[in-house]
Amino acid sequence: MIEMKNVKKGFSDDFLWGGATAANQIEGAYLEGGKGLSTSDFAAYKDPYEKGKVNNFTFDVSSAELKRYKEQPDEFDFPKRRGIDFYHRYEEDIALFAEMGFKVFRLSISWARIFPTGLEEKPNEEGLAFYDQVFDECAKYGIEPLVTMSHYEMPITLTEKYNGWMNRELVPLFEKYARAILERYKDKVKYWITFN
């Protein structure tokens, strides 16, 4: 039997206490700052407990649904377009993380905020500047950003034109995006995850 006096209490100094989010879940501001539409912007709310549905937790969207969502957007609720409004409230959110003692904050960068359609030659400076501000705010509190490049979303144009990752044409487009953010944030981000 283990004696309680021998059980270590608390975390070691090198333990990375923190939390995780995804751009498509928290940012909101889906058409602000030059951001283009992403696949997550078309994840309409579906009641997961709707009678007669076996599994309504998926965010799969058919071509017919996408067409309807684009033609009649006011008839549907797209919660990821709002998120928690991190885009406008990141300063107070990061201050709360610091209050909780976070040492690390795992977040993702929205590909559509950096390359609105995924096809642009140059990145969207307004989108890059937003993440500069987020990383600077983290640094202010000594919080280490751990950044995911792709967290279940991409510019909707790439799914419409190439059928997403089903087409290898996406590889150089993703590489362009990855190189842009790796170069831009090389002095602000030490830890990267390619795909969630």
Regions found by a protein language model. Name each.
Residues 54-68, 72-73, 92-196:
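Substrate-binding cleft and catalytic face of glycoside hydrolase catalytic domains
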Residues 2-124:
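N-terminal structural segment of carbohydrate-active enzymes
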